[in-house]
Amino acid sequence: MYRALTRDIEVTVEPYYLEEQSDPDDSRYVWGYRIIIANHSGLAVRLMTRYWHITDENGQVDEVSGPGVIGEQPLLNPGDTYEYSSGCPLDTPSGVMFGHYSMEAEGGETFDVAIPAFSLDSPGLVRTLN
């Protein structure tokens, strides 16, 4: 698992390889990842947008951004956690992802919360990117 803490908002990521959706003979490798966002602060926060920076093993970069996650803009009160799963396809057997969520605190202040960098590695792959 990978973790980052920004302003008492903790983001935990657990990536996993989706063998049944991958086809290495066709250069298609797919990973899922589970994210848990925990609000350890004393303020309610709403996840407004997401940003992902995805790099495959050849150095090809893809940037993804948009409102919320999986169609939601969850509100996390103090002590709350929010969990979701999503996925990432690549044309190479490994890569790395990182990013941030833009949050809005009660009172209207906005700030970014780090999503830790995490490796996407096919089973049996010897090297890793981080």
Curated annotation (Swiss-Prot):
Matches recorded under Pfam families: DUF525
UniProt-listed GO biological process terms: error-free translesion synthesis
Signal peptide: none
PROSITE patterns: APAG
Superkingdom of origin organism: Bacteria
Sequence ranges assigned to domain ApaG in this UniProt record: 3-127
Lineage, top ranks: Bacteria, Pseudomonadati, Pseudomonadota, Alphaproteobacteria, Hyphomicrobiales
Gene3D superfamilies: ApaG domain
Protein's organism: Rhizobium meliloti (strain 1021) (Ensifer meliloti)
Protein name, entry field: Protein ApaG
